Amino acid sequence: QIRTKLSKLGGTDWSRAKTKARAAAKDLAKGLIALYAERQRRPGFAFSPDSPWQKEFEEAFDYEETDDQLRAIAEIKADMERSTPMDRLLCGDVGYGKTEVALRAVMKCVLDGKQAAILVPTTVLAQQHYATALNRFRSFPVRIEVLSRFKTPAQKKQILQDAAAGKIDLLIGTHSLLQKSLHFKDLGLLIIDEEQRFGATHK
């Protein structure tokens, strides 16, 4: 049970709290503005046009794509092939096929020798994406790992080492992906699932 601390009537506690909150919001806004300005200033990596392996991966999809899926995939690929860092929001109802759209972007990233990461809000969702990705990439030499509380300390340490060495192509995880001890050798794509469940500072 959360107990909210109330300010006394006629006191200065509430006024100080508001001043502190405003200052924190301004600092965060300044940081975000600086970050977006830096993104626009610094060129990103322009991914290569689709390769035969990309086509083979997409043809292995068990279902027929919807028009919305195909449009989203085409737009994301076009973004990835530009030198400006991609910042795209993909919205869709449950069952829309967003995961397949994301995995095709992952494949495009990995084929250019880059690493990809999928950040999710819950351990259950991390395991679901891990199982889906393992099945989807089963015929391709793509190493996939999941970082969550189900891993032992030794397993977590090994995953961190392998990510830094570039031995992991796709890493899926919860907030553990945000830890300062995690370093990628060459991260080319970050996908945030259910991004509304992460704060602006995290993102």
Question: Which residues does each predicted region cover?
Answer:
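Conserved SF1/SF2 helicase motif Ia
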Residues: 87, 101-130, 138-143
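N-terminal pre-P-loop "Q-motif" helix
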Residues: 62-86, 100-101
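Conserved motor-coupling elements within RecA-like helicase/translocase cores
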Residues: 150-171, 178-187
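Conserved ATPase-coupling elements of RecA-like P-loop NTPase cores
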Residues: 102, 129-130, 179-185, 195-203
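Walker B catalytic acidic pair
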Residues: 174, 193-194
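Upstream accessory/linker segments immediately N-terminal to the RecA-like ATPase cores of bacterial MutS
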Residues: 1-70
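Conserved helix-turn-beta segment of the N-terminal RecA-like "Helicase ATP-binding" lobe
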Residues: 125-164
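Pre-Walker A (Motif I) flank of P-loop NTPase domains
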Residues: 81-92, 100, 113-115, 168
